[in-house]
Amino acid sequence: MEKLKIMVVFGTRPEAIKMAPLVLELQKQKEVIETITVVTAQHRQMLDQVLETFNIVPDYDLDIMGKSQTLLDITSKILNQLDPVIKKEKPDMVLVHGDTTTTFAASLVAFYNQVRIGHVEAGLRTFDKYSPYPEEMNRQMTDDLADLYFAPTGESKANILKENHPESSIVVTGNTAIDALKLTVQEDYHHEVLDQLDPAKKVILVTMHRRENQGQPMRAVFGALREMVDQEPTIEVVYPVHLSPAVQEAANDLLGDHDRIHLIEPLDVLDFHNLASRSYFIMSDSGGVQEEAPSLGKPVLVLRDTTERPEGVKAGTLKLVGTDPAVVKSTMTELLSNESLYLQMANARNPYGDGKASERIVQAIKHYFGQGEVAEEFHEGEKE
C-alpha cells in the first residue's frame, strides 16, 4: 500500500499549539503516512517557542513575517511561497487549522493545485463578518474550500451542515487544544513569576490581543482592571503581554508600575498552561483559552462582544463580558465574591474535548482515503 502524504500548514502560536498534537500523532503512523510540516511563521518568535516545546522541526519554513505587514501582504506572501512547495511535494491532503490568514491562504493554494483540504476546528461561527476580524471570514471561506471537516463539537458540525456540506465529510473530533494540555501540564512545574506572587492572594491571568479590541476597547478594559486591583487587595494580575506594539503600548501605559500587576514576556505553551492551572480565574479574548480553561477547572471571563464558542457559554464555563469597563468590573466583583457562582463555573463540564481529537482526525483521514475504519466521534459531556 502506498503511503499517504499529508501536509500540515500553520503559522501562528495558537495554530501551532493545536496542530502540534496532530503532527505528533501523524508521525506515529510513519508506516502508512508521510507527514510534511510547513510553517509560514506568521508569528515568528511565539511560533518558535511552541515548536521547541513539542520538539517539532518543520520541513519547510516560509518565514513570511515582516514589520508592519498588512493582511494583504501576509496573504500574497503565503500564496506565492507555498505554491512551489505544494507543487514539489504533491501531497494527498493539506491540513489547515482554524481561522488565521495562513489558514485561508494555504487552503486557496491547495485548491488551486487540486489538492484535498482537511480543516481542523471547522464550523466555528459568530455570523458577524467583522467580529472577529478577519477570522470569521477566513474560516467561512476555508470551509467553502475544504473536503474533510474536523468539527470540534456537535454545534460546529450543525453549522457546517447548514451551509450544505455533506454529512459524510464531517467528523466531530473534540478540540486538539485539550490534547495539547495533556502533554504540557505538570504537577511539579515552576516559573520565576510564581516567586513574585503572594500565595495568599487570588491570581487572575489575563490575555488580550485581538485586532478588533486594540485601541479604545483594550484601554477601557485595562483601566477597569487597574481600578479593580486597587480596590481588591486580595488579587494579583499576571499578564503575558502580546508582542504587538499597540498592545505593548496600552499595557505599559495603563497597567505598568503596579506592585500587584505583573506584565511579563509572552509565555511558551508549557508556561502558559501551567500558570493557567495555578490561577483563580482567567480573563481573555483568546479563542484557545476558552477551550483550554474548562479542562483546568478555571472560569473564563471573555473580553469580547461575540464568541464562536457558544458551547462554553451554555455549559457555564465561560461568561461573555465584552469590553465595557463597568461590566468588566461588576463581573469580576461577582466572581470574586460569590463562591457558589465560582464553583459552578469551575466545575462545569468541558464541552470541547477529551484529549483524543488527534487520534480521531488521523483515523478519519485514513478512512477518507480507504485505509481504515470510520473514526469514532467525540460526544460532548463525556469524561476526559
Q: Which residues are covered by each model-predicted region?
A:
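Nucleotide-activated sugar donor-binding and catalytic core shared by glycosyltransferases
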Residues: 1-239, 244-384
